[in-house]
Regions:
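Loop-rich non-cytosolic ectodomains and luminal regions
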Residues: 110
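Acidic/His- and Gly-rich active-site-bordering loop/insert found
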Residues: 2-107
């Protein structure tokens, strides 16, 4: 099995875990420069997922490591969100993490 297939297989294994935990992240407000709470949540989730090493660096980024082989795979993503704006324009609470028809709704759920 090549690396791409291994990654896809592992992602499939973690699909339910991801679906359970994405709403937790959506429920945690993480406006720009206020990401500490969601960073701590991500650390907990990565530890629960079995990462060998997880920490928050000096810039507030979550760093996680699995294994220690010669090959490296890096993921880079932002964990902040922008303000909600007018809450009356939302069809649901933007921090509810509501799941409807298999889709998680809320601020930051899709990017």
């Amino acid at each position: 099995m090549n690396m791409h297939e291994k990654i896809k297989a592992r992602a499939k294994e973690l699909r339910s875990y991801t679906a359970e935990n994405l709403p937790k992240m959506v429920k945690t407000k993480s406006y720009s420069s206020q990401e500490e709470d969601v960073a701590r949540l991500i650390v907990t989730l990565l530890e629960e997922a079995g990462f060998d090493e997880v920490y928050i660096d000096g810039l507030g980024s979550v760093i996680g490591r699995v294994g220690n082989g010669p090959k490296k795979l890096a993921f880079d993503a932002h964990i902040d969100t922008v303000e909600v704006g007018n809450p009356d324009l939302w069809n649901f609470d933007p921090f509810s993490g509501e799941i409807k028809d298999g889709i998680v709704y809320g601020r930051g759920a899709s990017d």
